[in-house]
Amino acid sequence: MTSYLGDNLDILLGREFLTWLWYRGETSSGMFRFSGSKNDDDVFFVTLEQRLTVTGGEGDHKETASVSGSFSPLLEARAGLSAGKQVNRALIRFVRGELDWQMTLNAESLRINALKTPPQSKQEEGDDPDAFFLEKMYLIEQAMTLFNETYKKFLNVRLSPKDWAAEVRNIQ
């Protein structure tokens, strides 16, 4: 039985996405704008935080380096990138206006392992009992909207051979 052909492609795209996201965060302050918008309210920022894992090689020759530290320059991870490794897992921060989300993303499955939403307003007596839950769902939906928009931007670059070749040269 052969594995699904897309398995390797999914892993590759996930690693390329996180590596590209790190690069974008370093070179453009991680600034993104919703597609088709010129409104300043539609700007958001995405950065990889001080905890990530880089992986390179295949099978028995697979090497992984995990790096974390507050305000760390991530030198080991940078050395891994220059050796051809790619980001495999990362803590990603999304900021839009006053709101701040954090998620841990696994590149192999593009699975969100953890999601921290912005703080919710305090529930006061007389408030709708469902308000707290609905606000939390709204914040989760906003996180997914930001993630989807970021991934869409990546795919626009990745699916253009000319744009992707230029981006890879810049990343290396």
Where are the regions a protein language model picked out?
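Intrinsically disordered, low-complexity, charge-rich terminal extensions
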Residues: 1-172
